[in-house]
Amino acid sequence: MMTHKALRSSLVATAVAGLCTLNSGCLLMLSQLGNGGDDDFIEGDDVRLALPSGVSMRAGDPSEIRGDVYVIIDNTIKDTNTWVTGSVEGMAAIYRFLDRRRETSTDGDWRVYGPYADDDGRDLAWLVKLDDVEGVQKFELHVGPRDAKSVADVDKLLDGELSVDQNLRSGGFNLYFDTIEAHPEMKNEDDSLHTFSGMIHVTFERDVDTQRKQIDIKFDDFQVLYQGFLDDDTFFSDETYNYRTEDDGSGSFHLALYGQWDDWGWSGPETEKMVLDMAWTPDGEGRSRGQILEVDGVGDLKHGDLDINECFVSDGYITWRTINDAYIDEVPDYNIGEESVCVLGIEALPG
């Protein structure tokens, strides 16, 4: 499917940016020192996404394949785990470490730690603000120039809160990408090809006694501009990324993102909307759909809107797959099976 490379490149860029903010300089040192401790604190599993049974490695009939949409969603989930889980685990570890130490100063009710000069020698300094109100741990992460002396000299990179109420863990955080651009030394060589703007708001809730979990990622004027050696690509979104699992193990996934999907020559430089949806049963059987849509007459898809539908068994192998008629001449052998084998109808999809 032509969208795979383009979608992954945009999400990987986001992941790298999110990770470098929490795993750089002195903050990496602090997170390593802070590992372990309070079992009631937020943990990686609280925000980790997964398909029903993951992608199994069992040997099978060579004719068995996983669908394009299934593979894209699986890779998107893995990319998202990298920076969402990394952000939460990193911030939780930093909170544990600093919460047991005397603050550098105070700012109202906030305890302020730093600014600390970056351990890697870059022109960066890091500052953390913590507060605890009735069991809700609030945090802010700031970054500024290496000679920063106070809160006034740094910019907010991330803020959020974490809480635990018996078996229910919840929280959220905001990641401000404009701050990354204001301090480009946070970027590594690969990131230097990307320009970020806007913010992402992540919220999550998990019942540790069941399989119920929900994770929402709201894009707010979020944009990634990739400036490559051969061409440029832009990806942006004001939509929401949703992941749900219920008590019985059933679940759903939804993501919408605008971008340029021209890797296979089925689209030109215009921007279209990609929509990915999936739903699955407690047994892990399910249905997925991938669409690339022209919006308000904008787009240059070769044959208009693209629509791929799939059904799969619990290990992700497809039982049915179809592409809309407008594109079947491009891939005449694409359609497989009959829709009657699907355990879920299209109405089960969240989009």
Predicted regions and their residues:
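Bacterial N-terminal signal peptides that target proteins for export
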Residues: 2-12
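Hydrophobic helical h-region of N-terminal Sec-dependent signal peptides
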Residues: 12-16, 20
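C-terminal motif of bacterial Sec signal peptides marking the signal peptidase cleavage site
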Residues: 22-25
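N-terminal "mature head" segments of proteins
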Residues: 27-135, 308-351
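Short N-terminal edge-element motif at the start of the domain
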Residues: 93-195
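Acidic surface patches and DE-rich sequence motifs
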Residues: 105, 117-119, 133, 145-149, ...
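Short helix-loop boundary/capping segments
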Residues: 155-277
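Extended, charged low-complexity segments
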Residues: 248-250, 254-351
